[in-house]
Amino acid sequence: MAHKKSGGVAKNGRDSLPKYLGVKVGDGQIVKAGNILVRQRGTRFYPGKNVGMGRDFTLFALKDGRVKFETKNNKKYVSVYEE
């Protein structure tokens, strides 16, 4: 029974795909209804005026207009103001 025990298996070799999170439009930029403004995990930014929030916390424009980033009560809000 002169067998050699099999060697271990490499424990590396995995890599997850990028999630492409972050702010997608700048302050003062003009957007159309449905445009994605922020992709995030959790509420780093809260929806303000004319902005909706998806199931995965994505913020998107509900109306055409200009993007405005605002801070109220230590919370960051993203709003869209019609022109």
UniProtKB/Swiss-Prot annotation:
A GO cellular component entry from the record: cytosolic large ribosomal subunit
A GO MF label: structural constituent of ribosome
Entry superkingdom: Bacteria
GO biological process, one term: translation
PROSITE patterns found in the cross-reference section: RIBOSOMAL_L27
InterPro entries per UniProt: Ribosomal_bL27, Ribosomal_bL27_CS
Family label: Belongs to the bacterial ribosomal protein bL27 family.
Protein's UniProt name: Large ribosomal subunit protein bL27
Organism encoding this protein: Thermotoga maritima (strain ATCC 43589 / DSM 3109 / JCM 10099 / NBRC 100826 / MSB8)
